[in-house]
Amino acid sequence: MNLQLSDLQYAVDVAMGRQPGSLLLKNARLVNVFTLEIQHTHILLAGRLIAAVGPAYAQAPAAEVVDLEGRWVAPGLIDGHVHLESSLVSPAEYAKGVVPRGVTGVVTDPHEIANVAGVAGIEWLMQASEGLPLEVWITVPSSVPSTPLETSGAVLGLAEIERLLAHPRVVGVAELMSFPAILAADATELGKVLLAERSRKSPEGHAPTLVGPALQGYLASGIASDHESTTLEEGRAKLEAGCFLMVREGSTTRNLEALAPLLRPEHGERIGLVTDDRLPSDLLREGGVDFLVRKAIGLGVDPAYAIRAGSWNVARHYRLLRRGAIAPGFQADLVVLDDLHSFRAQAVYQQGRRGGWRWPCPRPKSRGRFRTPCGCPNCTPRICKYRPARGRCG
């Protein structure tokens, strides 16, 4: 969100009663992710921003007034770690699937894209995710190729990572998967951590099963998070060591049930919810990070804290300004709910706008050639060249 001075002036004027707001949401039950309380209140918007929240705004002038009649309002959810390419669709199609469910932002690691197309592939993702009603932040893949044994389509070295870190929507260096190299104090791997820190961005982790001295050594590098915990003991050890714990529930790796006891208010801002990899069938049937919020609540997690772990905590971890909460000055990303426990979105506002969103579909970065056997069961396989303009083999 590129705010202008006029946006801030408008928000202040609306809050002070000098101008009418763009939208007044009356009689809301607001999920306050700061206090974990439910507030009976009114929410006044000024364009893309929330201007004011409070009982004093029941009769505030606004271009549009919506009486929520006691419905719940939560901040838009943010998926803290996802590989968008696992959905097998473009960012625009992905957004179509998750925004109506209440997901208004994702932090993606385009690891597979980078291993095929390198910097050009990441730049395509940046272009393809621009202007959507889903905000897409990017972490620069740190392991391209994944191992020295692989033959990848590209290599991302320190120079390429440093260049990509300069992009305003890049929020970190993605999961540093080579934990043996980190533990061996490898100069290249530790250099990636330094690049992230010098850019004031987050070096993200990947530390499956690490506990004890190995975990201490891994975190001593400055790596900030991990999403690979599979047991309660492992998750607790990482929390105790100061790691930002990402609780994952993907399509194949599902850890939420094991880690749900750690989703407690006393753990504050140190836990976030992530999907990592979700297949199209699971996105359609279950949803994105909204499914994690629902499931966490079903497992006994306090609803306000489950929502906080899927919004404010992620925003804080990545320093996403004005995101993840419903309060004056925050971006107006709101989810209206008929029932708090089921977390089924009745309406979604993204940057103060409900529906009517654009779904741009950028052209492919290059024509590309895909070799695939014919799908006919009773004929000899043939090799064909896929022509994107025609959408078929020929």
Identify the function of each model-found stretch.
Residues M1-G47, A51, V99-R101, L284-G300, ...:
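Active-site microenvironment of metallo-dependent hydrolases
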Residues N2-V14, A92-S202, E266:
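Divalent-metal coordination cores built from histidine and acidic residues
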Residues A28, R48, G70, H81, ...:
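Divalent metal-coordination and catalytic microenvironments
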Residues I78-S90, P145-L158, A224, E228:
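Active-site mouth loops of central-metabolism enzymes
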Residues V155-A174, A181-M246, T253-V274, L284-G298, ...:
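Histidine/acidic residue-rich metal-binding segments in metalloenzymes
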